[in-house]
Regions:
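ABC-type ATPase nucleotide-binding domains, specifically the catalytic core motifs of the NBD
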Residues: 15, 33, 71, 96-118, ...
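The feature captures the beta-strand-to-loop junction immediately N-terminal to the Walker
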Residues: 36-38
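Helix-to-loop junction immediately C-terminal to a conserved catalytic motif
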Residues: 51
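ABC ATPase NBD coupling module
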Residues: 55, 67-88, 92, 113-116, ...
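Conserved ABC ATPase signature
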Residues: 137-141, 145
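ABC ATPase C-loop
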Residues: 154-155
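Helical segment within the ABC ATPase nucleotide-binding domain
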Residues: 177-191
Length: 241
C-alpha cells in the first residue's frame, strides 16, 4: 500500500533542549497508529512538529509526495493535515457553529462557504449533541462536548491526516469510549490516516491498527497493535502494565 505519510530522521526540540531523535514513521491511508510512551517521552512534541507548530532541526516529513518541512500550519491544513491538540483549543467566547466554521477558514473562492457549510452539516450528523447546541458558546459545553467540537472543527477541513493528542483526557469513561469508537468509523468512511496519542494504552491499542512506542524521544518499538499488546516485556518496560 502506498504510504500517505513518510517521516525520516526527524529531530526537534525547544531551544537548546532536544526532544526527538531520528524518528522514522510510516502511515498508510485508512489506518490508525497509536503513539505510546511515558509522560515526557516526546509524543506531543512529535505531533506539534508534524502539524507545523514546531520546526524540526533535521529530517523529512513527506505527505503524499510533498515535503512539509518549512511549510506553515495554514499551508499544511490546505494539504490535508489537521491537529486536535491536548486541551482541545475550543474558543469559549464563540458559539459551536462559529468554532466549527474556523475549520474551513483556509478555503478560498466562490464555493468555499458552501463547502464549509456542507462539512459542518456532516459534523452535526456525527455529533448530535453539537447539533442541539449549535448556538451555545464553547464555555457552556461539557468536557465531552468540547472534545466533540474540537474533533468536529478538524473534520470540517476534511483532512487526509489527523493528529489527535489525548482525546480522552478528563472525559467520563462512556464518553471517552464513544469518541474512540468514532475514530474507527471515521477511518473506515474517509480513508484518512490517524496518529493518536492517548494516555489510556488499552483503549488506544484496541482501536489502532499499528503502534509505535516512544522513549526519551526515540522510537524503541513498532508493530501491529495486537502484537504490542501481547508483548509482556515491552508492556512492563515502556507502557506501565
Amino acid at each position: 500500500m502506498t504510504e500517505l505519510l513518510e517521516v525520516e530522521g526527524l529531530c526537534a526540540g525547544y531551544g537548546a533542549a532536544p526532544v526527538l531523535h531520528d524518528v522514522d514513521l510510516r502511515l498508510a491511508p485508512g489506518t490508525i497508529t497509536a503513539v505510546l510512551g511515558a509522560n515526557g517521552a516526546g509524543k506531543t512534541t512529535l505531533l506539534r512538529t508534524l502539524s507545523g507548530l514546531l520546526r524540526p532541526s533535521a529530517g523529512r516529513i513527506d505527505l503524499t509526495g510533498r515535503d512539509l518541512i518549512g511549510l506553515p500550519v495554514e499551508r499544511r491544513v490546505m494539504l490535508g493535515v489537521a491537529h486536535v491538540p491536548e486541551g482541545r483549543g475550543v474558543i469559549g467566547e464563540l458559539t459551536v457553529q462559529e468554532n466549527l466554521r474556523l475549520g474551513g477558514l483556509w478555503r478560498k473562492g466562490a464555493g468555499a462557504r458552501r463547502e464549509t457549510d456542507v462539512a459542518i452539516a456532516e459534523v452535526y450528523d456525527l455529533f448530535e449533541p453539537l447539533a442541539r447546541r449549535r448556538g451555545y458558546h464553547g464555555h457552556q459545553l461539557s468536557g465531552g462536548e468540547r472534545q466533540m467540537l474540537a474533533l468536529g472543527r478538524a473534520l470540517v477541513a476534511r483532512p487526509k491526516f489527523l493528529l489527535l493528542d489525548e482525546p480522552s483526557l478528563g472525559l467520563a469513561p462512556v464518553v471517552a469510549a464513544s469518541i474512540m469508537a468514532l475514530l474507527r468509523t471515521l477511518r473506515d468512511a474517509s480513508g484518512m490516516a490517524v496518529l493518536l496519542v492517548e494516555q489510556n494504552v488499552h483503549s488506544a491499542l484496541a482501536i489502532a491498527d499499528e503502534g509505535v512506542v516512544v522513549s526519551l524521544g526515540r522510537v524503541v518499538a513498532r508493530g501491529k497493535a495486537a502484537d504490542l499488546q501481547a508483548d509482556e516485556g515491552l508492556r512492563h518496560a515502556y507502557l506501565g502494565f
